[in-house]
């Protein structure tokens, strides 16, 4: 007999050490919480598939290592490990795979997800139930039988045959118990006279109630009122008990007065339909063994044993306290136990089968029984939910919840089986994941679920057979499940027929027809997949999708076929089932002389098979007596031997009276050890179990003549009867051959169906459009600024390159002409001639015009202090030979004013150079030069004809002669004359400073430099520095009034002041003087310009009042897009920039800036809502017209210009249930985080195709076609957090991060040499200009120090600008980088150590593997001859702060570095922690240690530290598993100890 496990079993040293720690007060809770947090952290982080494969592989290895040692702690660890893997899968499913494009896809995908959530819930509940089976052992009864209680044995019956019931009754009468203390009652709801007669004959009590109300429960309740025993023992009428039943079970009931129920297993000595009908079923454990062998024993640990309706003892007082057996549901047994436990009663389970019964003979009966169970458990779930109400512990609630919700499996099972059909038939991909991702996440989840269940179930249930059981019943239970949940009162009790015979085998179509239909549909889906894979033209993505779903469909089909195969009923002619038994017997004559001795092989109520050697040839049936001794009692049974030979004899009983029948029952069923081998099956081997399931499918295709006629189960038993591969070496070969045949058959059927599936439509994978929008860069120009290189539409807004506030070209007004004539009278006499090619003006290349894009143009500006006196346009290019001079032309206009017309010459397609004079009066500050292509005749053209085109060469020239206008020195004109916003080119602003370069004066200059940076924005600004006023041109002079150059005449100032004075050496130039009586006033004066809240005065002099500046907050720069709410496009650009005209309107751009240190949980995309309007009517081709959306030259998505709702939408619109599509469309779009950095640009390209091609159309149709983005379109960055891994010079190159985190640079200090030269100061000012352009805010908070005073700003980020002559002073600031500057060279001084490399390789094995052949690059380069270096590292003064050093031996090198920051094309090459610039060449390096800046909410730290780090995920996850297992094992042991403490004490006394 198994003993109760003690909590003080031998443990390993590690376990003992952990036990000592856990014994400390509060340690267990602390360790448990820490372990749970670690486990949650590890499950919350998703990894790329290739990294997840590492986690999966290691977890599989650990599974085999731990699973090799069978122990309770190992099982708990495997369950927790399985939970870790499954929760990682669940996290991945919820966060990475739920991307649906259609409502049908969303519906199907959601259904699959809900089914998976149900499966995971059941998995975890099963782990909870079985985490610590109690293994309860029998307790001895009091030694004096007089102290034993009285027992009433109930045998309820309704319509069963007497031949079945009499076995149970006679077996009950033979139970070893004092006769005066036990009474057997036949509860006959059929009220049959033969049963009453039998009761009188055998000595049982017969009870028949007048009505059949409440079926079995009512029958039992009626009997309770007519009996008075202390306990009630219930047997179903086919369950024959062993004689030791009460002696082995009553000890617990007597010992513990709180136990209301003692349940024992339901063992069936006949095979169930799965064992009998499937070819591999005979070696498979019965379906019910899992529940009685594992689940109930686990329930007992939680004091949640269920009453199963039979083979159980109940305490009468407990039953009477709840008002009798429950009658509200059709499963009175489970509901009765629940009611008793709600009142505080305990239940117990003894895992020793003490009765044997009949399994359902036919599949349809089996299904009917399960339908009743499902209905009853779901009724309890609805009307008496265990999660609610009083009296239950959480352990009991969860165990009951598991039992009830397990019968909800039908709908999820159907969903799992049919899910691949969503893609194979409808092209709906309901899991948005690659096959590699599924392999990395789903397969490990299934492996651990199956493997851990195999370790738990051992030989009680084989892997994959639950799928067959569920599939067999699922389609029958779907309706029952739904109806019962909606209406729990429906349904009635049905009695399961037992003991039937089958004269011949047949196929029970009624039991499997739903699965046949499902199987045919699945086969069609599989055939479709095979056909597409074989003959379809698929891209790689579609091919993988078909392969994955076809494999899924194949697995589903195998399970369905196995379920169908159960319907192949085999014949059953025997009235009595054979029961294997090994009992010594003697065969004697009538006179008592022994003929032969032997050992029985099997027994039944019809006879016995005995191993023996019959001494003589058997001439016919011979009467004999079989004698044996059972438990000290001799049994002599009359029989006849009917066959003998081969060491075996077959006997049949010759029963003449009730006593002889009683003796046979005692021999066959009543032995105390009759069923001890009930669970003696081989341990589960999942792969072999899968092969058995496949082999069972083969039986479905056998002919009627091949049906195996088995009269009884040949169950694998201990000893010689056990089926063993070592005894049957050909078994594996047979399994393999059967598998090969099955696969071949399926392949043949699939191939045969491919011809029929050939005409089926193929799902075509969506592709990105071949044409993707491209963002136009705006290169700086030497004199005039081009505003666009795309299509410039007359009278419309800029198509993509105009910045905010830039004016559009307008026809020249009369008052403008008068003003120009008036100004011309005072102009200088010096004229300047400018020659610009179209490329110089901003054309990306030659300008080509076609019918769909007939209007192309260029925007440029004229400085406001210049007057155009003459101009000429010199053109060259080519025109299509198909053009005709009488109908086709190219017309040039400037600001809507006619310049000239080009006519084609078919004989000479090329033309030019051709010169066109331009009236200088046409020019304004902002100008638009347009080229308009006419491709038709008489107002009609074929705009879609690609053979009609005209091209203007990019080398065509615009020659402009200008003279300077007299200066107008008004502060209100600032930033003119230094920068004219109409002239969009790189700006140069000379700065005049005293040679001492006082830090306060430098700060004032830096404020002004950043203000100019804001004005020039992305154009860039350079500040050449000198100590003297230039001989010509404009300049800014900053200094204390008393220190200003005497050439200015010492202007009188009474405080902070700003003045515009003429350049003493150039009357047409202006000097902007920023001054004050002291250095503080100079700073105030510079702030007066930079922070002016109102327009500056229309005067040349301004006294500045002190300026109050509010402290800045992180990431609040005016240039940065708001991140706490969705931002409208209309707040980023003017509405005109969002509009386009014509079928091809060019690229509409929406630029914005954002801090680059953005981080989202799991790299969740940002949200963008695109709203756009397209004209109604039939002008465009709906199927081909689209809007392409991109960001930073990365394609995101395309949308049709006219929203369509498909067939369903058309039908709904037709009946008036849906509104027709409107011109406004609204689409939500995901923006991947990796596409966003500091300077960003959204690109929108409308590509509208005309409805009719090749047909003459109105020439005005194209220009009348208007498309545009709605200004209420939004982009939302509110889900982003700020954190970044440094060093990363790319952040600096885009928006000056991390220094611009505070827009005024209040957390930044600039480190300059003690005596900087002009080049160093110029580099400083250029850098401040760059910062101002990045933030649109003056750098009023920056501090300037020398290297000797950096300790005063230790808590700030440091910007170091130095030449090699002073490099020694700043060397300590770079101590945390891997570089040093010495002897004019920049060198690498340190690499990671071997230990660091090893740690890095373990932390990120994939990267280490990819970089295994690469070596760190050593840097050794001279910083002379214009070579500059930019180094970024963590500050040695304060952790988390950054040092950025700009180093060179000369000003040219520093200037080169600063110019590099302003060139967008070069920004992409600025990366890592070191950039070396040499002319146009850039080299980036990454060697220095990394560090992190920024903060995250606590819940985001796991994702930040473990994303892309599989080893970290493993370490944290396994640590959590170990800690949780340690705490769980101790807690479970203590719980078991509490459960048994009093009884163990009692046993020790005995």
Swiss-Prot record:
Residues of the active site: 189, 333
Binding positions (substrate): 236, 238
E.C. number: 2.4.1.12
Primary localization class, coarse: membrane
Region described as Catalytic: 1-741
Pathway field: Glycan metabolism; bacterial cellulose biosynthesis
Catalytic subdomain B, as annotated region: 317-377
Positions of region (Disordered): 711-734, 768-813
Record keywords, A-Z: c-di-GMP, Cell inner membrane, Cell membrane, Cellulose biosynthesis, Glycosyltransferase, Membrane, Transferase, Transmembrane, Transmembrane helix
GO biological process, one term: UDP-alpha-D-glucose metabolic process
Record region (Catalytic subdomain A): 147-240
Membrane topology: Multi-pass membrane protein
GO annotation, cellular component aspect: plasma membrane
Induction / repression: Cellulose is produced at a linear rate with respect to cell growth when O(2) is present.
Low complexity bias locations: 768-796
Family designation: In the N-terminal section; belongs to the glycosyltransferase 2 family. In the C-terminal section; belongs to the AcsB/BcsB family.
Domain notes: There are two conserved domains in the globular part of the catalytic subunit: the N-terminal domain (domain A) contains the conserved DXD motif and is possibly involved in catalysis and substrate binding. The C-terminal domain (domain B) contains the QXXRW motif and is present only in processive glycosyl transferases. It could be involved in the processivity function of the enzyme, possibly required for holding the growing glycan chain in the active site.
Name of this protein: Cellulose synthase 1
Protein species of origin: Komagataeibacter xylinus (Gluconacetobacter xylinus)
């Amino acid at each position: 007999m198994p003993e109760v496990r003690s909590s003080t079993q031998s443990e390993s040293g590690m376990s003992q050490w952990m036990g000592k720690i856990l014994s400390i007060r509060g340690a267990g809770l602390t360790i448990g919480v820490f372990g749970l947090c670690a486990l949650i952290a590890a499950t919350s982080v998703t990894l790329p598939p290739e990294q997840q494969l590492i986690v999966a592989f290691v977890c599989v290895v650990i599974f085999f290592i731990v699973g090799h040692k069978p122990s309770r702690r190992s099982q708990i660890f495997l369950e927790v490990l399985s939970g870790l893997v499954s929760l990682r899968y669940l996290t991945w499913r919820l966060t990475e795979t739920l991307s649906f494009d259609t409502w049908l896809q969303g519906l199907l995908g959601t259904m699959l997800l809900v089914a998976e959530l149900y499966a995971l819930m059941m998995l975890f509940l099963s782990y909870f139930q079985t985490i610590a089976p109690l293994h309860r052992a029998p307790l001895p009864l009091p030694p004096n039988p007089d102290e034993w209680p009285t027992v009433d044995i109930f045998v309820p019956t309704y319509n069963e045959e007497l031949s079945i019931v009499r076995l149970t009754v006679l077996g009950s009468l033979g139970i070893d118990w004092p006769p005066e203390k036990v009474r057997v009652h036949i509860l006959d709801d059929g009220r049959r006279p033969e049963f009453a007669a039998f009761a009188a004959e055998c000595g049982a009590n017969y009870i028949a109630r007048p009505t059949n109300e409440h079926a079995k429960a009512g029958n039992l309740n009626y009997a309770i009122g007519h009996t008075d025993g202390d306990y009630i023992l219930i047997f179903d009428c086919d369950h024959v008990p062993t004689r030791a039943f009460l002696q082995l079970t009553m000890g617990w009931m007597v010992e513990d007065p709180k136990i209301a129920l003692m349940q024992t297993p339901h063992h069936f000595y006949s095979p169930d339909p799965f064992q009998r009908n499937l070819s591999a079923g005979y070696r498979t454990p019965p379906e019910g063994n899992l529940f009685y062998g594992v689940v109930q024993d686990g329930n007992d640990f939680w004091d949640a044993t269920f009453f199963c309706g039979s083979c159980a003892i109940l305490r009468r007082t407990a039953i009477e306290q709840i008002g009798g057996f429950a009658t509200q549901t059709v499963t009175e047994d489970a509901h009765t136990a629940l009611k008793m436990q709600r009142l505080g009663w305990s239940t117990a389970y003894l895992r020793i089968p003490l009765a044997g019964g009949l399994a359902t003979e036919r599949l349809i009966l089996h299904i009917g029984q399960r339908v009743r169970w499902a209905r009853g458990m779901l009724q309890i779930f609805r009307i008496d939910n265990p999660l609610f109400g009083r009296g239950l512990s959480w352990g009991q609630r969860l165990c009951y919840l598991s039992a009830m919700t397990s019968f909800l499996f039908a709908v999820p099972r159907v969903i799992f089986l049919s899910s691949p059909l969503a893609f194979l038939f409808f092209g709906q991909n309901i899991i948005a994941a690659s096959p590699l991702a599924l392999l990395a996440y789903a397969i490990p989840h299934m492996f651990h679920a199956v493997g851990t269940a195999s370790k738990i179930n051992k030989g009680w249930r084989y892997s994959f057979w639950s799928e067959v059981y569920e599939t067999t019943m699922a389609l029958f239970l779907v309706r029952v499940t739904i109806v019962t949940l909606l209406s729990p009162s429906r349904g009635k009790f049905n009695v399961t027929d037992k003991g039937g015979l089958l004269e011949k085998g047949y196929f029970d179509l009624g039991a499997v027809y739903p699965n046949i239909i499902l199987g045919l549909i699945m086969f069609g889906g599989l055939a479709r997949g095979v056909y597409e894979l074989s003959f379809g033209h698929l891209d790689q993505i579609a091919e993988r999708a078909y392969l994955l779903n076809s494999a899924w469909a194949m697995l589903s089909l195998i399970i369905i076929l196995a379920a169908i195969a159960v319907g192949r009923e085999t014949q059953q002619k025997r009235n009595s089932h054979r029961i294997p038994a090994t009992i010594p017997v003697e065969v004697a004559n009538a006179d008592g002389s022994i003929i032969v001795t032997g050992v029985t092989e099997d027994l039944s109520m019809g006879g016995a098979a005995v191993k023996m050697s019959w001494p003589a040839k058997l001439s016919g049936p011979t009467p004999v007596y079989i004698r044996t001794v059972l438990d000290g009692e001799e049994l002599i049974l009359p029989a006849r031997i009917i066959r003998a030979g081969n060491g075996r004899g077959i006997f049949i009983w010759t029963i003449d009276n009730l006593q002889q029948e009683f003796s046979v029952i005692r021999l066959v069923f009543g032995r105390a050890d009759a069923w001890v081998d009930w669970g003696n099956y081989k341990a589960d081997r999942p792969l072999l179990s899968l092969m058995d399931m496949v082999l069972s499918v083969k039986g479905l295709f056998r002919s009627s003549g091949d049906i195996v006629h088995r009269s009884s189960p040949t169950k694998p038993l201990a000893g010689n009867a056990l089926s063993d591969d070592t005894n049957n070496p050909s078994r594996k070969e047979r399994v393999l051959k059967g598998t090969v045949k099955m696969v071949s058959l399926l392949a043949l059927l699939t191939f045969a169906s491919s011809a029929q599936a050939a005409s089926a439509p193929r799902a075509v994978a969506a592709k990105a459009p071949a044409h993707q929008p491209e963002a136009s860069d705006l290169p700086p120009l030497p004199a005039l600024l081009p505003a666009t290189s795309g299509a410039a539409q007359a009278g419309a807004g800029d198509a993509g390159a105009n910045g905010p506030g830039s004016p559009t070209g307008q026809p020249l007004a009369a008052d403008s002409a008068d003003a120009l004539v008036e100004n011309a009278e005072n102009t200088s006499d010096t004229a300047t001639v400018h020659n610009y090619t179209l490329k110089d003006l901003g054309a990306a290349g030659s300008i080509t015009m076609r019918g769909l894009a007939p209007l192309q143009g260029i925007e440029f500006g004229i400085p406001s202090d210049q007057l155009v006196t003459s101009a000429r346009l010199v053109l060259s290019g080519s025109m299509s030979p198909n053009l005709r001079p009488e109908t086709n032309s190219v017309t040039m206009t400037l600001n809507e004013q006619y310049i000239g017309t080009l006519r084609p010459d078919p004989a000479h397609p090329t033309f030019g150079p051709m010169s066109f004079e331009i009236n200088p009066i046409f020019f304004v500050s902002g100008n638009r030069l347009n080229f308009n292509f006419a491709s038709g005749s008489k107002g009609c053209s074929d705009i879609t004809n690609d053979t009609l085109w005209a091209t203007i060469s990019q080398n065509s020239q615009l020659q402009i002669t200008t003279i300077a206008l007299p200066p107008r020195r008004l502060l209100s004109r600032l930033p003119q004359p230094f920068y004219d916003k109409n002239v969009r080119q790189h700006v140069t602003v000379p700065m005049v400073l005293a040679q001492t370069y006082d830090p306060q004066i430098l700060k004032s200059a830096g404020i002004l430099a950043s203000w100019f940076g804001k004005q020039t924005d992305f154009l860039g600004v350079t500040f050449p520095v000198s100590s003297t006023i230039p001989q010509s041109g404009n300049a800014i002079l900053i200094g204390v009034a008393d220190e200003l150059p005497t050439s200015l005449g010492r202007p009188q100032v009474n405080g902070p002041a700003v003045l515009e004075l003429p350049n003493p050496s150039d009357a047409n130039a202006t000097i902007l003087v920023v001054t004050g009586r002291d250095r503080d006033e100079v700073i105030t004066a510079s702030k007066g310009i930079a922070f002016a809240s109102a327009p500056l005065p229309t005067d040349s002099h301004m006294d500045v009042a002190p300026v109050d500046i509010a402290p800045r907050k992180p990431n609040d720069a005016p240039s940065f897009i708001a991140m706490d709410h969705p931002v409208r496009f209309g707040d980023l650009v003017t509405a005109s920039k969002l509009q386009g005209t014509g079928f091809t309107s060019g690229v509409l751009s929406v630029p914005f800036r954002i801090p680059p240190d953005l981080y989202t949980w799991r790299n969740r995309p940002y949200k963008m809502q695109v709203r756009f309007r397209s004209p109604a009517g039939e002008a465009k081709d709906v199927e081909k017209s689209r809007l392409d959306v991109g960001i930073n030259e990365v394609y995101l998505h395309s949308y049709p210009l006219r929203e369509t709702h498909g067939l369903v939408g058309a039908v709904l619109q037709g009946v008036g249930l849906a509104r027709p599509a409107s011109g406004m469309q609204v689409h939500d779009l995901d923006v991947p985080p990796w596409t966003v950095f500091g300077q960003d640009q959204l690109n929108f390209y409308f590509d509208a195709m005309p409805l009719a091609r090749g047909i003459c159309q109105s020439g005005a149709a194209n220009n009348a076609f208007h498309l545009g983005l709605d200004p209420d379109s939004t982009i939302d960055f509110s889900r982003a957090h700020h954190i970044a891994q440094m060093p990363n010079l790319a952040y600096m190159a885009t928006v000056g991060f991390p220094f611009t985190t505070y827009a005024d640079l209040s957390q930044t200090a600039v480190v300059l040499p003690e005596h900087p030269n002009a080049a160093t100061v110029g580099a400083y000012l250029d850098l401040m200009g760059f910062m101002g352009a990045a933030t649109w805010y003056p750098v009023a908070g920056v501090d300037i120090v020398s290297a000797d005073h950096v300790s005063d700003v230790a808590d700030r980020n440091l910007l170091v600008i130095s030449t090699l002559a002073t490099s020694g002073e700043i060397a300590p600031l770079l101590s945390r980088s891997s570089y040093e500057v010495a002897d004019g060279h920049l060198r690498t001084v340190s690499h990671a150590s071997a230990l660091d490399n090893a740690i890095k390789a373990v932390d990120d094995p994939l990267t280490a593997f990819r970089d295994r052949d690469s070596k760190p690059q050593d840097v050794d380069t001279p910083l002379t001859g214009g070579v500059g270096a930019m180094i970024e590292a963590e500050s040695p003064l304060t952790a988390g702060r950054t040092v950025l050093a700009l180093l060179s031996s000369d000003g040219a090198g520093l200037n080169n570095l600063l110019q590099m920051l302003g060139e967008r094309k070069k920004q992409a090459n600025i990366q890592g922690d070191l950039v070396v610039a040499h002319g146009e060449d850039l080299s980036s390096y990454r060697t220095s240690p990394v560090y992190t800046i920024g903060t995250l909410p606590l819940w985001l730290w796991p994702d930040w530290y473990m994303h892309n780090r599989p080893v970290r995920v493993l370490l944290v996850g396994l640590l959590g598993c170990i800690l949780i297992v340690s705490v769980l094992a101790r807690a479970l042991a203590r719980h078991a100890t509490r459960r048994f403490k009093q009884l163990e004490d009692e046993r020790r006394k005995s």
